[in-house]
């Protein structure tokens, strides 16, 4: 009896150990990847000069141009500490990785946007002041250059070969913790995110936090298959949804920046929307798919080729268009000046149309990037919101002569109380046209606190007036 108990115990122990070893054997070992790549992943810190007003200042100081004799004269009669606003350094952190042994580094556009100085720190703690060779907002890719040689370069893979469920690994500097390693799996491929139409993101559940941006995403072969770019979160922290830029797209952008200082993208010239189940039925489709053409822009490649409103684009250069979000990346990476084969559904019949692809009119790239005031969002504390400029092309497409776009609403605040929404385009304040960020600043500074003011905003549904009451904060 005692022997049987011992036998049963030994059998159970053997099964437990066997299962443990089999589970352990089935898990990937990331140590080799980390060891081989650690010298090629860098920490990036930026410094930005921002105005700093004196908290003891009792009265507003006129904003004279730098070096103005009026400004110097005015300051002579002010008490100490009430002169022109001083400036302080604002710092932020990110990651990047070396793509050539002579010092070229890849990172995100948003990591270095607006930077006055960029410092790159290697794994051995060596630091370099980096030059921003170029930065492309549309793809969120930036290229840096440091004065160094014989640097270790990472290997590049092919993100097209990735499979959903495959293990991936990220290395970066979340919250400044250098060379932190996290792992997860590929959750989906070809994701489209708002305002990032030209990037088919790789979605993963790898833990990504502030500071990881710009760092590499590896496959199990130790090859870079993406650049960690952003997360989806309702709290600001990691919630299991991370997005990376495919490495092929990033390297294509980087090469264009290095060679020409700008990025060229294909342009079709249509406004599209998703095909719903009800629309699919009306078009004689067995299931909803494709991109429905809602508008064909005048003199565009699509117009010249004969594309029409109501056409459903179901294929582009041999690749299926399952969702409307699939089309912009396909068009964007097509070759300018060459014919593209566009498969459409028209009058319940499928047909092929050749379209000569033109270059996207709006260039979001800035070679030898230098921040401009007009590029940066402007905030109105009294109105409780921040706005950004519209490009000429955006104004043209929206058929607007003026306007600035709302990108952030303070909660609570005047804008929230007035019912203003992110994405609203403000074209008029207090019966004055808003043509630029400068107009927005000038008009809002002259508003009376507590007095209701009319704003004209443009929404997809059309223009609407809203009343807002500036708050004295």
Q: Where do the model's predicted regions map?
A:
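C-terminal recognition in membrane/secretory proteostasis and scaffolding
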Residues: 2, 8, 21, 26, ...
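Bacterial N-terminal signal peptides
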Residues: 10-20
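Glycine-biased strand-turn-strand hairpin within the trypsin-fold
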Residues: 27-32, 37-105, 113-115, 126-127, ...
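Active-site loop architecture of trypsin-fold serine endopeptidases
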Residues: 29-30, 47-57, 89, 115-118, ...
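Active-site substrate-binding loop(s) of clan PA
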Residues: 31-33, 121, 131-133, 150-177, ...
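Gly/Ser-rich catalytic serine loop of serine hydrolases
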Residues: 92-95, 154-156, 203-218, 298-302, ...
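Short, acidic, Ser/Thr-enriched surface-loop or helix-capping motifs
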Residues: 93, 99-100, 122, 127, ...
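Short, conserved beta-turn/loop elements at beta-strand boundaries and strand-helix junctions
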Residues: 101, 135-139, 190-194, 275-277, ...
């Amino acid at each position: 009896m005692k022997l049987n108990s011992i036998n049963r115990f030994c059998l159970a122990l053997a099964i437990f150990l066997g299962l443990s070893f089999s589970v352990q054997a089935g898990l990937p070992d990331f140590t080799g990847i980390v060891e081989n790549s650690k010298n090629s992943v860098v920490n990036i810190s930026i410094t930005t000069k921002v105005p700093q007003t004196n908290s003891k200042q009792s009265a507003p100081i006129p904003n004279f141009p730098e070096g103005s004799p009026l400004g110097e004269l005015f300051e002579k009669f002010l008490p100490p500490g009430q002169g022109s606003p001083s400036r302080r350094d604002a710092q932020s952190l990110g990651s990047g990785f070396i793509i050539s042994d002579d010092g070229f580094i890849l990172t995100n556009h948003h990591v270095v946007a607006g930077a006055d100085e960029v410092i790159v720190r290697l794994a051995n703690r060596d630091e370099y002041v980096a030059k921003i060779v170029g930065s492309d907002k549309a793809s969120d890719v930036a290229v840096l250059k440091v004065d160094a040689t014989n640097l270790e370069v990472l290997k590049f893979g092919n993100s097209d070969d990735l499979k959903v469920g495959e293990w991936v690994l990220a290395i970066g500097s979340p919250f400044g913790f250098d060379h932190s390693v996290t792992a997860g799996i590929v959750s989906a491929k070809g994701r489209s995110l708002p305002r990032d139409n030209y990037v088919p993101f790789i979605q993963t559940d790898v833990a990504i936090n502030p500071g990881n941006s710009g760092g590499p995403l590896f496959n199990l072969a130790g090859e870079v298959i993406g650049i960690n770019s952003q997360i989806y979160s309702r709290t600001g922290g990691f919630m299991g949804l991370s997005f990376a830029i495919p490495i092929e797209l990033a390297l294509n952008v980087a090469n264009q920046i290095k060679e020409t200082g700008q990025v060229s993208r294909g342009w079709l010239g249509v406004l599209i929307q998703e095909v719903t189940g009800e629309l699919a039925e009306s078009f004689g489709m067995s299931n909803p798919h494709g991109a429905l053409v809602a508008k064909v822009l005048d003199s565009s490649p699509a117009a010249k080729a004969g594309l029409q409103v109501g056409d459903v684009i179901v294929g582009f250069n041999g690749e299926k268009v399952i969702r409307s979000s699939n089309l912009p990346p396909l068009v964007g990476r097509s070759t300018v000046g060459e014919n593209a084969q566009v498969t459409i559904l028209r009058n319940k019949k499928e047909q092929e149309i050749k379209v000569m692809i033109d270059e996207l009119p709006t260039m979001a790239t800035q070679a030898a990037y230098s921040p401009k005031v007009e590029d940066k969002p402007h905030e109105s504390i009294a109105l409780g919101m921040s706005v950004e400029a519209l490009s000429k092309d955006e104004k043209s497409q929206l058929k607007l002569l003026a306007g600035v776009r709302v990108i952030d609403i303070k909660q609570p605040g005047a804008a929230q109380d007035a019912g203003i929404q992110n994405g609203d385009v403000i074209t008029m304040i207090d019966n004055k046209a808003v043509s630029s960020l400068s107009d927005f600043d000038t008009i809002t500074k002259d508003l009376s606190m507590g007095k209701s003011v009319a704003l004209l905003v443009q929404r997809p549904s059309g223009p609407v007036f809203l009343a807002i009451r500036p708050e004295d904060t």
